[in-house]
Amino acid sequence: MSSQYSNVENLSPQTIRQVMKELQDMETTPPEGIKVLINESDVTDIQALIDGPAGTPYAVGIFRVKLTLSKDFPQTPPKAYFLTKIFHPNVAANGEICVNTLKKDWKPDLGIKHILLTIKCLLIVPNPESALNEEAGKMLLERYDDYSQRARMMTEIHAQPVKCGVSDAKDDDGPSNKKHAGLDKKLQDKKKEKLLKEKKRMLKRL
């Protein structure tokens, strides 16, 4: 990966070791509902999958987040982004996350795990008073049912886990199996496309 997109060469060896150790610890013993994705060639590229917490409009989704470490990390906080589209008061249109832990409440010893847990907590308890998405913040405060419906619909459209197809056709290279597998996939794609169009149409009405 080009250093143009990375701060790895600007971090001290001690910081790199510390970050890598924490990521490996989280991979071995993951926090509940969080799976860290390690890029061993660039520890400044930190991504994780967060399960939408039960009892929230995000419950059925899996959300991909990214942390970008600055060259002064851990003295300065990283920037955090949702790579998965989400309707949330504290998430901007470009995915940037607004949370006090990454601003005025930042402390150098908090660590990556604490940041990811804080982001997960933000899905449970949004903070509309410091909204980056003003529409979502206002809707949450004034029309919670509409907010919940909109957030749930965005989750169903954008945050669904990728389901692997049945592997039988892959194991059997017979032309018949290949043909049926192709037809099944086309039918599934059409159904999915139709469902997405219906949901997007409903979103526009909100």
Swiss-Prot record:
- What Enzyme Commission number(s) appear in the record? 2.3.2.23
Keywords, sorted A to Z: ATP-binding, Cell cycle, Cell division, Nucleotide-binding, Transferase, Ubl conjugation pathway
Matching InterPro entries: Ub_conjugating_enzyme, UBQ-conjugat_E2_core, UBQ-conjugating_AS, UBQ-conjugating_enzyme/RWD
Q: Where is this region: Disordered?
A: 165-191
Membrane spanning stretches: none
Named in its record, the pathway it takes part in is: Protein modification; protein ubiquitination
Q: Which Pfam families match?
A: UQ_con
Q: What does this protein do?
A: Catalyzes the covalent attachment of ubiquitin to other proteins. Acts as an essential factor of the anaphase promoting complex/cyclosome (APC/C), a cell cycle-regulated ubiquitin ligase that controls progression through mitosis. Acts by specifically elongating polyubiquitin chains initiated by the E2 enzyme vih/UbcH10 on APC/C substrates, enhancing the degradation of APC/C substrates by the proteasome and promoting mitotic exit.
Q: Where is the composition biased (Basic and acidic residues)?
A: 168-191
Organism expressing this protein natively: Drosophila mojavensis (Fruit fly)
Q: Which residues form the active site?
A: C98
Q: Which GO terms describe its molecular function?
A: ATP binding; ubiquitin conjugating enzyme activity
Please state what the protein is called: Ubiquitin-conjugating enzyme E2 S
Q: Which reaction does it catalyse?
A: S-ubiquitinyl-[E1 ubiquitin-activating enzyme]-L-cysteine + [E2 ubiquitin-conjugating enzyme]-L-cysteine = [E1 ubiquitin-activating enzyme]-L-cysteine + S-ubiquitinyl-[E2 ubiquitin-conjugating enzyme]-L-cysteine
GO BP terms: anaphase-promoting complex-dependent catabolic process; cell division; exit from mitosis; protein ubiquitination
Q: Which family does it belong to?
A: Belongs to the ubiquitin-conjugating enzyme family.
